């Protein structure tokens, strides 16, 4: 196995390829724009139920009130298809209406995730990230993140993204 494509450095190697190989970059941008550009809005589970309609309207207002475009959040999350997983930490805030909303949804780069907290059944309970600025290890509980994994071919918490297929054989 090519050492550049193993361990945490594989995420940097893949990111470098995504930035510097035009055909790869074009494919990534095309896919991410397809998933991010539709108008995102919540649908009430029962359009005849006033509470369901109210909750859908609340979700729409949370998406509109966040400090970054929802399409940007979707694009960052969509990188799970390429890297195998993605982690976004949501930051809560008190809204003017007294409800809890989202201040932001911050991407946690794959190369910063060093360990996984997994129970005996394989359920991911959280992950540990190395802070790129301080090198401190920080715990991220699953309840505080959006964790998306491509687990069709593996039960690893890191999933198996399509970048894996770009690795050159080492011979």
Regions found by a protein language model. Name each.
Residues 1-67:
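Extended, helix-rich architectural segments
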Residues 50-171:
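Structured, contiguous alpha/beta core segments that scaffold functional sites
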């Amino acid at each position: 196995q090519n050492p550049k494509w193993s361990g945490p450095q594989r995420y940097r190697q893949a990111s470098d390829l995504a930035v510097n190989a035009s055909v790869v970059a074009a494919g990534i941008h095309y896919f991410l724009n397809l998933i991010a550009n539709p108008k995102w809005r919540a649908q009430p589970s029962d359009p005849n139920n006033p509470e369901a309609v109210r909750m859908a309207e609340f979700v729409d207002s949370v998406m509109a009130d966040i400090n970054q475009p929802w399409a940007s959040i979707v694009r960052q999350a969509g990188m799970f298809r390429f890297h195998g997983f993605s982690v976004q930490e949501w930051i809560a805030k008190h809204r003017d209406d007294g409800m809890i909303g989202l201040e932001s949804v911050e991407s946690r780069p794959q190369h910063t995730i060093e360990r996984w907290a997994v129970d005996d059944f394989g359920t991911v309970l959280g992950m540990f990230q190395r802070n790129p600025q301080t090198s401190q290890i920080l715990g991220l509980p699953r309840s505080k993140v959006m964790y998306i994994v491509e687990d069709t071919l593996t039960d690893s918490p890191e999933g198996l993204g399509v970048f894996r297929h770009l690795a050159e054989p080492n011979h």
